[in-house]
Amino acid sequence: MPQDVEFTSAGDIVRGHLYKPEGDGPFPIVVMAGGWCYVKELVQPYYAAAFVRAGCAALVFDYRRFGDSDGTPRQHLDPWDQIEDYKNAISYAETLAIVDPDRIGVWGISYSGGHALIVGATDARVKCLVSTIPVVDGLRNMQRVHGSIGFRRLRDAMLADRRTRFSTGDYGYIPMSSPDFATETVTWPFPEVTEAFANLQATEAPNHEHRNTIASVENLTNYTVFPYLERILNTPTLMIVAEGDDITLWDDEIDAFNKIPTAKKRLFVVDHTTHMVLYSNRSQLEIAANQGARWFREHLVEPFAK
């Protein structure tokens, strides 16, 4: 069973789960957080279990404003705040007696797959990273998945919300996804997103809320990993993409991978799958989890084996 933990990030209490292998350590640790509107119970325990089997501890946390963590407005995604939460989670991990602070890895999926790249590029404490089906350029992502007409509607909603926030201070909300995405303004206009997250909420992540602030989408359109990739000079980097992923756009992901200069990098394509299958199909999830576990074992465990 994981251990409940908490630490402070920018004045708010962030809560998480610590998973650890048998024994006293010190162990390498993988710092983990989720994608869009994730909570720590959603999918991530399966990945954490794989990393523990590989000999690593794992720290999974809820971002500020989500799940069990403090912070307002609720369900508001600021990627730079989330990246700061990652770095504060690393600082917390360094204080743990069971952790070897010289063997810290980061892992992310979907939106946080991009965060893992940026954290790895900007925090020298990160010695290894895994980026799974990442968001790499938010504006391009939103324009492509919504199409020209849909993106006009989304842009109008963002501008109207900004004016309302200026006048009243109140944040507006839209669904993360919806079966009625053709007529309703949503963030991710895919029916399989609605179905998969409803099932995950019912079976393993009751804290998940399937909505986000409209300002979160504006933040997404100003988010890109590309300026940071050139700074990943020597950090072992694994990127896992889903063949044909049209949600976070596998062609853009591969373009980002090709711009990472380190020679210690690997691209793994999960064949015959989709973005959401890596959430909902345990056999496909296991493929991605085991690839990440092998990567962390290769770079954080085996070189230090006595």
What is each PLM-predicted segment?
Residues 40-43, 66-105, 282-287:
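Catalytic nucleophile-loop/oxyanion-hole region of alpha/beta-hydrolase
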Residues 246-252:
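Conserved alpha/beta-hydrolase "acid-adjacent" motif
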Residues 50-70:
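Conserved alpha/beta-hydrolase
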Residues 117-197:
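Alpha/beta-hydrolase-fold enzymes
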Residues 26-35:
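Short beta-strand element of the alpha/beta-hydrolase
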Residues 271-273, 277-306:
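Catalytic active-site module of serine/aspartate enzymes centered on a nucleophile-bearing elbow/loop
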Residues 1-25, 279:
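N-terminal cap/lid segment of alpha/beta-hydrolase-fold proteins
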